[in-house]
């Protein structure tokens, strides 16, 4: 190919940015899944603890023990509320990361399309030059044969 793609540095930069956006999106998705798992764990733990409270109530509890169960359930509820907010925040971060990835990918595809078009144009030019060389060679070959026939 005669001419190098003039936007190759930009194409390389866009590829690097897209790779970084992909890596970052992977981290955001993993963080969101981790936050969801923690929330699920807290909700399961609360359900188990509430079941223990009901079982203890059927067997009889002292007012102090009942208060301890209720206080602990309130703390678990607070933790669930905080973790729910963390999940919401993590979802927003993931959505933002997806938008960033889409934008970087869109830019990369635009530059990559230009690169492919450039390569195609260069191949067409190269093919025309090769054809011209072959045609000239063929003309010379027949011209030499024609001179031999005249002699």
Outline where the language-model segments fall.
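Charge-rich amphipathic alpha-helical interaction elements
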Residues: 1-151
